Amino acid sequence: MADQHVERVASVWYVELSGPDAAQVLRGVLNTLPAQAGFQGAELLSSPAQPQLALIASRWAGEPPSLPVPDGAKHWVFTVLEARP
């Protein structure tokens, strides 16, 4: 059996923004994340049920660095308690 290395995600950082340009604004934030230490991946999300709401869900090897968020954005860091592949 091949040795599989799975990088452990320790934290998830969510950033939420509402408004007609929310996805465009958060896309700018998303583009800065790969250069940060501990970054493991992220998605920019939207929902047809809430068309003016956009969300970044990013995964980190440890605590995410303290990063600026756009005016009006809400953000939270969660500790990953359990994960499944």
Where are the predicted features?
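Short S/T/G/P-rich N-terminal loop/turn motif that feeds into the first structured element of a domain
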Residues: 1-85
